[in-house]
Amino acid sequence: SNVSILAAYSIFTQNFLLFCIANFFIGIGMAFTHQYRFAAAESVEKDKAPKAISTLLLAGIVAAFIGISLANYTKNFVSDYLYVGSYLTLAILTLVPAFLLFFFKDKRDVSIISNENNKVRSYSEFFSDPRFLQAITSAAFAYAVMSFLMTATPISMHIVHNLSLEKTGIVLQFHVLAMFLPSLVTGNLIKKHGYSKMMYAGVFFYILTILMSLFEPSYINYFIGLIFLGIGWNFLFISGTSLLVTIYKPEEKFKAQGFNDFIVYSVQAVASLCAGVFLNLTSWKTMNLICIIFIIIIVIATLRTDFLQKKPQ
């Protein structure tokens, strides 16, 4: 809340460095909200974790549309200082979860977690577990592909191919919708078909995304391609996160979750930063073809786990 006010103040004083610092700390705050999905998964039985995570991510639809609308509606609240009102609104919104968490009491038995005799595996031991590699690979490279292409989309559509900002905005809105709307059924599908099959389904939609990029770079092709991209991300990310929850022991959860998120969001950040560079050096079609590398890695990690599980002990 305070850093949102600081961001508003930096706009008011025209201090760009302070604005960057404020947004950096806003980003840190937003990173903590990603832990809510693990809290949701741990609040239910492990076989119900996929549905719990899906339900939580479904809220992203509301956030996507309300967030954009609120930002546009409040950006001119303070005349002559664009977006000061948006940041002040953000400061108020961040108080809502703070208020709810203030009254939250965890009544679960934490004796297992706090017991010093319980051995926590090292990072190398985590990596020796093929299921852990499958989970982290699915989530990380799902985010890499999605972020790599989504970040480049508005530049490719509006700057490179001269499509209107209105059409670009519609494509991105429906892409976000496709990222979260499948959450209505993803949890149930994982429970019915298993983690690996849902990961293969996510890969299938990523392949469809790449195929759409091979056609003429028209509005409708971007539109369909980005919808496939969103669905693929949903299947892969929720499957990977849900699988991770089943792997670690209670005393390992903080280490496993922290390490998972460090890898996933570091990979996403690098992919996002590289998007503009690659679009400038290559093309939209080439960027999509590059994503085949990440897809192959996901498939290999999943096939490896499936093979080892079927292999006689």
Name each model-derived stretch.
Residues 106-136:
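Juxtamembrane intracellular "pre-TM" segments in multi-pass secondary transporters
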Residues 18, 55-102:
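Helix-loop-helix hairpin linking two adjacent transmembrane segments in secondary transporters
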Residues 91-112, 301-306:
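C-terminal membrane-cytosol helix-exit motif in multi-pass small-molecule transporters
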Residues 182-195, 279:
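Helix-to-loop junctions at the C-terminal end of transmembrane segments
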Residues 1-14, 205-217:
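C-terminal ends and interior cores of transmembrane alpha-helices
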Residues 151-167:
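Short amphipathic helix-loop junctions that connect adjacent transmembrane helices
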Residues 24-58:
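Cytoplasmic helix-loop-helix junction between adjacent transmembrane helices
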